[in-house]
Amino acid sequence: MSKTHRIEKDSMGEVRVPADALYGAQTQRAVENFPISGRRFGRRFIEALGRLKEAAAETNVELGLLTPERGAAIAAASREVAEGGWDDHFPLDIYQTGSGTSTNMNANEVIAALANRAATGAAHVHANDHVNYGQSSNDIIPTAIHVSCRAALSGELIPALGHLRDALAEKARDFDGIVKSGRTHLMDATPVRLGQEFGGYARQATLGMGRVERAGEELAEVALGGTATGTGINAHPEFAGRTMARVAATYGIEFREAEDHFEAQGAKDACVSLAGALNTVAASLMKIADDVRWLASGPTSGISEIQLPAVQPGSSIMPGKVNPVMCEALMMVCARVMGNATTVTIGGQRGNFELNVMMPVMADALLESITLLANAATVFADRCIAGITARPERARELLERNPSIATALNARIGYDKATIVAKKAANEGRSVREVVEEMGLIDADELDDALDVRQMTEPGVPGSG
């Protein structure tokens, strides 16, 4: 043994492990086998794994399967891991064994080492025999995925979407009196209110919250208790139920043992469902960010019906240019989340027989998507939406030149004549009002009601009383 390394042994023989590492031989083998991406499991996942190991130790003491001293040492060490004190000792790449066995053993070895610092020799803690008692990587890792994702949804994403919804709803109220051109196919359409557009965006955020909440409910069922293949071999029949009750109390979130362990371990459909919900949220936010970007385009040659807050200089060569950077950042986040949804979908297909074998990458993709969406939604609300101002004069200018206003005349002069008016107005660069007056199609005293653009933004026939 050198000053920098020590020798550890496992079933395959001796391994050189860094002298100051809490982990042992199995983790070191994985370090050497998988130097692939440098991406490690994040805080949420390690916390979940620690909480599960803590609860498992307490349950095993309660069931008489671990001595109180040994169980207390394991629980205390697991708590330290959950609280983030030893994250540097979780070095493994997410691209590893598809069951996550390497990371489970990483946790077992670290927790055993910490527990042995506190326990007496008579209560020596073994990574497999004691820390992992009643568990398999095949049930503890999928359970950690569900716990970490459910916690991230309730603690990060759902509040962030609510914050964005509130910011959008406030703008919907502020802008409700501003009538502007609607647009379909990127072409001028009948009038809408700017507040209606922002109200639609707020509704998208609200529906997105509901979608991820419902998807999160599917994660309440966990695989713990199924052990290796779903049969529950080597686990006390009450182990999973009692353990998950403890975890639920810690997080303040419901968790329960799966109704069918073969589904819970052989398939990851709940994860695929969550990825789909996150993908839908990403599609919604992409649409909102892109609309806001277009509405602010200009300032002289675009739509320019709203103005975004200037948060940084936009160009290294063009003086005074300000770009919609918050929109662009959000759109890139959405692109990443959409890619992650594909990753999770493919991963979900690899549940061969009794075990899914792409769980680490699925866990990473889901947790990354949740955090990215939460952070991006928050900064988009605070640094973009909250500071948007309307340009009602510009909206009025464009609306007056909009030939689709002629739609309001259908009930009075018929579709064919209204089409002639719209084309003439567009071709000659004139307003619909001017063309109608020139053609004498509607009495002058009725024209104001017929072309009341505010009425056009509500159900009914404009000017019909």
List PLM regions with ranges.
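Conserved, well-structured ligand/cofactor-binding cores
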Residues: M1-G465
